[in-house]
A protein has these predicted regions:
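C-terminal, well-structured subdomains that either form a transmembrane helix-short loop-helix hairpin
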Residues: 17-22, 26, 114, 120-127, ...
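Active-site beta-alpha turn of Rossmann-fold NAD(P)-dependent dehydrogenases/reductases
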Residues: 105, 141-144, 194, 206
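NAD(P)-dependent short-chain dehydrogenase/reductase
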Residues: 154-163, 191-239
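Flexible loop/turn segments at secondary-structure boundaries
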Residues: 24-25, 49-52, 86-88, 108-112, ...
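Phosphate/diphosphate-binding loops
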Residues: 176-190
């Protein structure tokens, strides 16, 4: 609740493992951490079409920001080539002094043909939780979405005049959309881990749009569901 947010104790992030650093939100989490925190940040990513993970991340940081962070690689920015869907890739970090995991990795396409979205958005979360549970001190932060509360209950008799807040998760809402369903299931996994003693936070993010300061938007803007909906409305002359 808001009261818990205002009255709760603020804990330091320490050294962070960040997944999803190549995404629009993830790269800004990385930037804000470097600018405002003192610890190291471990970024698990794939090299993609680039020759190395470092080359890929530097390319993205140069695209979004005017500052040069290349001198921080190897000292404050530690790169781990890996995939959150592979539990063995988390084992590469067994001896690293990680205090907090921030999971910003996800397939955010609202419409997909196969079930790979569940492998990333759900199984990837389970792997991160398993790694976090290997140490009592690790905190786990799950980046979720307000879309888990985006529909009315399919059973309005059981949930009359339902009011939604940050504590609401299941009210028999429509979960046929694979993206929404995957993020819902991920939240369930995180909350289950909390009952087992893991320190967790779930942050539900709204629509990601262009940066307020200068209008910069995500490089792969064509995958943004909200923007595609706006374009569809315009193309159908509903505007």
């Amino acid at each position: 609740t808001l009261e818990n947010f205002l009255d709760g104790e603020k804990s330091k992030l320490g050294n962070v493992l960040l997944t999803g650093a190549t995404g629009f939100l993830g790269i800004h989490i990385l930037y804000e951490f470097i600018k405002n925190e003192e610890g190291k940040i471990y970024c698990m990513l794939r090299k993609g079409k680039f020759d190395s993970c470092e080359e890929r991340l530097i390319d993205l940081m140069n695209y979004y920001f005017d500052e040069d962070f290349s001198n921080l690689f190897g000292s404050r920015i530690i790169l781990i080539e890996g995939d959150i869907t592979e539990i063995d890739d988390f084992k590469k970090l067994e001896d690293e002094p990680i205090d907090t995991i921030i999971n910003a990795a996800a397939i955010v396409k609202h419409y997909t043909a196969d079930d790979y979205i569940f492998k990333v958005n759900v199984d990837g979360v389970i792997n991160g939780i398993k790694f976090a549970q290997t140490r009592k001190s690790i905190k786990y932060v799950q980046i979720s979405t307000i879309s888990v509360l985006s529909s009315y209950s399919l059973n309005e008799k059981a949930y009359p005049n339902q009011k939604y807040n940050e504590r609401t998760l299941y009210y028999e809402q429509d979960l046929t959309n694979k993206y929404i369903c995957s993020k819902f299931l991920a939240e369930r996994m995180v909350l289950e881990a909390a009952t087992q003693g893991l320190s967790v936070k779930i942050i539900r993010v709204g629509n990601l749009m262009s940066r307020y300061s200068d209008g910069m938007f995500q490089k792969n803007y064509d995958t943004n569901a909200f923007l595609n909906n706006i374009k569809a409305i315009k193309n159908l002359n509903f505007s």
